[in-house]
Swiss-Prot record:
Name of the featured protein: CinA-like protein
Pfam assignment, any one: CinA
SUPFAM superfamilies for this protein: CinA-like (SSF142433), Molybdenum cofactor biosynthesis proteins (SSF53218)
Coiled-coil regions, chain positions: none
HAMAP family: CinA_B (MF_00226_B)
InterPro entries xrefs: CinA, CinA-like_C, CinA_C, CinA_KH, Competence-induced_CinA, MoaB/Mog-like_dom_sf, MoaB/Mog_dom
Record-stated family: Belongs to the CinA family.
Superkingdom as given in the UniProt entry: Bacteria
């Protein structure tokens, strides 16, 4: 798309999106695709299932953009209004495509959907000169249509699997041929743990002002990401643009950067333990198995993960982890002493190289002035039962899942740093 072009917009149609009943993953995915094509995507809109509002938005977009991509509203129900609204926006009629009706009947021949033939048939009507985008995964086709000179509309159903298939099989090549210039965007994402977004941003002010590549920080729960994006003619050229910035960042944050792109803390930790031929076990209380789940969600975790004990009650801490009743009474289940014993005892019982014990108060109830909600103890037992103890106090305004998730991240990142300092 030339520098003087108006750009691309995404219009998501569906009242369920406005009400927050479902997450709009379609717009995110399409945005990524447009970035890869190097297109000037500058606006996203969402509108409910209201014919007049859809028409108004489409007419506005047609005056300021070259390309509109819509999702949703192509189905057989009365509130599926997209195709009709688009046609009305440009004062044209819809005409039936008989071959589409034959295809829909074939797709629904063994389904109760065919009983609702009049509703299904509405999906076969399009403007006269529109190009059909076939839908191999559903009954609602999309279209490519240029209602006025210099403005093209592509429509897709709202079902993500259907939309993605149609995009890959038809739309991608069309958009690339008609709208994309010889440049594309390529990105590399660096992932940080143990440092906040503002702290990262303060240390890279000079990089945040770069034009090509651009550097942008953004944060998830317990994790910061830096996306380095280059505009280039090909991937090799982009990598050469990105490389010096990436190397500078890795020198500036040698301990905080744990991975790139699709890396996760669990996957990085599994890879490091496997390289060392070492194993790990967990004794969990406040995280309730979330730590174990984070590891076992990664393929290949069986190489290093032997198992865990989720000892939520004091009785199980005593019977399964051999935590003495005296220590439980003296220090309490949420204490450094008990957490340390949890890690050491499960390590020795299961014969692993490493063990992590975690105990705390995830809330919203159960806290006290001495031990408030958000207090978490983590103990990591290594070779020769060497212990590393960590105490975290999370803000009590955080909810239960956030405290558990942050605790899991600290467990994994703390062990990663220990392994990093003891590289074999």
């Amino acid at each position: 798309m030339s520098p003087n072009s108006k750009g691309v917009e995404i219009l998501s149609i569906g009242t369920e999106l406005l009400l927050g009943n479902i997450t709009n993953t379609n717009a995110q995915w399409i945005s990524e695709q447009l970035s890869q094509l190097g297109l000037n995507h500058f606006r996203q809109s969402t509108v409910g299932d209201n014919r007049d509002r859809i028409i108004k938005v489409i007419q506005e977009i047609s005056q300021r953009s070259n390309l509109l991509i819509t999702t949703g509203g192509l189905g057989p129900t009365p509130d599926d209004l997209t195709t009709e609204a688009i046609a009305t926006s440009f004062n044209v009629s819809l005409f039936e495509r008989p071959h589409l009706w034959d295809e829909i009947k074939q797709k629904t021949s063994n389904s109760k959907l065919q009983d609702n033939s009049s509703s299904l048939r509405k999906q076969c009507f399009f403007p006269k000169n529109a190009q059909i985008i076939n839908n191999p995964r559903g009954t609602a086709p999309g279209m490519i249509w240029e209602p006025i000179k210099g403005f093209t509309i592509l429509t897709f159903p709202g079902v993500p699997s259907e939309m993605k298939t149609m995009w890959k099989e038809t739309a991608f090549d069309f958009i690339k041929t008609k709208f994309s210039d010889s440049y594309s965007f390529f990105s590399k994402t660096l992932k940080f743990s143990g440092i906040g977004e503002s702290s990262v941003a303060e240390k890279i002010n000079d990089l945040l002002n770069l034009k090509n590549p651009t550097v942008a920080p953004y944060a998830n729960l317990g994790e910061v990401k830096l996306r380095i994006t280059a505009r280039a003619k090909n991937e090799v050229e982009a990598k050469n643009i990105i490389k010096p910035v990436k190397e500078k960042l890795k020198k500036k944050f040698p301990k905080f950067i744990f991975g790139e792109d699709n890396d996760t803390l669990p996957s990085v930790l599994i890879k490091e333990l496997a390289k060392r031929n070492e194993t790990i076990v967990f004794a969990e209380s406040c995280t309730g198995g979330l730590l174990s789940s984070s590891i076992t969600s990664i393929s290949g975790s069986s190489q290093v993960f032997q198992g865990s004990i989720v000892s939520y009650s004091n009785e199980l801490k005593n019977s399964l982890l051999n935590i003495s009743e005296d220590n439980l009474k003296k220090y309490g289940a949420v204490s450094e002493e008990v957490c340390e014993a949890m890690a050491i005892n499960i390590k020795n019982r299961l014969g692993a190289d490493w063990a992590i014990g975690v105990s705390g108060i995830a809330g919203p109830n159960g806290g006290s002035q001495e031990k408030p909600v958000g207090l978490v103890y983590i103990s990591i037992a290594g070779p020769n039962n060497h212990i590393t103890n960590i105490k975290k106090k999370y803000n009590s305004t955080r909810n239960r899942i956030e405290i558990q998730t942050l605790s899991v991240n600290v467990c994994l990142n703390s062990l990663r740093l220990i392994l990093l300092s003891n590289s074999k």
